[in-house]
Amino acid sequence: MRLCFCLLVACVLPSLAAKDMIRTPLDVPMLGELEEYLAQNLLFNQKNRDAGLANINQKPGFKALIKKHGIKLFGGPVIGKVSPTSAVVWLRTPDSAEVKVVAQPGNITGTARTSKARDFTTEVELKGLKPWTQYSYTVTVNGEPALGSLKPSFRTAPARAQKVKFDIAFGGGARVNPTKEIIWDHVAKTKPFGFLFLGDNLYIDKPLERNRQRLYYYRRQLRPEYQRLMSSTAAYAIWDDHDFGANDCAGGLDPFKPAWKVPVWNVFKENWPNAYFGGGEKQPGCWFDFNIGDVDFFMTDGRYYRDYKKGTMLGPVQKKWLLEKLKASKATFKVICSG
């Protein structure tokens, strides 16, 4: 295994206030027009802080842009939950839709439906795959091809005892900046098996505004550079201060206070195909573990339960989880990841 460090474009915020979004120029096909519409209707003229696609996708202006640019996917595809015999394809559609993914070789098919319950995202599961095998795939939405000229593929994980070489890329601190999004193409050229998103994957800094959080995810996920990388690369994500709360924030030991913590967690879950998210509804968070062959990865959450007075980053439940997982691990290599 080789670890490839990718330094993503970051904007370090000196205060708790979010900086204005860097706009994509209006003359950039699709993205300029679409971003401006989203900003006006989800952010500047939106009083509902929990707003998402369901609040705008029936508006004539939105429908006109979707039709004009032939948009079938409003995010994705992103590869996730890769095992030796399975994987999921995460994606978002502009409205409720039937989605089908077909992987080759083997004509392996998965189907799912998107709905407003998860902000029109879903995970299409592909089962019965072979270990350490390259698969190409197609996506249709309501029976129509959805990927245009994109021809994505992914590789399944090796079996535990299978000795293989693979690359993992990792990074964080990635404010959406239209002129810098080319970084994703540079990462893609290294053909990593997976990418570890180590927090500050977006600079949101407004934990009370789910509408802003969703808007920022849309902006990143609609970038063609990001799509080219993540449609063929397994994603593993945790957050840090700027995509969880605000600069240098500490969530505290109470799982449900401040009251914004769980809603932020729910938005995060909509947007990442992780194996699981912390301790679930009773102990929310973004920590999880996974393995690739003889390497065990432990993705930690250093914000949700951080408490400066108590001197803890993880909180007692997550710390117990981490120690137990490390003790139980039989892998030759163990990688602990933190934002």
What are the residue ranges of the model-derived segments?
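Sec-dependent N-terminal signal peptides
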Residues: 3-12
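Sec/Tat signal peptide C-region and signal peptidase I cleavage site
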Residues: 13-17
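Metal-dependent phosphoester/phosphodiester hydrolase catalytic core
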Residues: 19-339
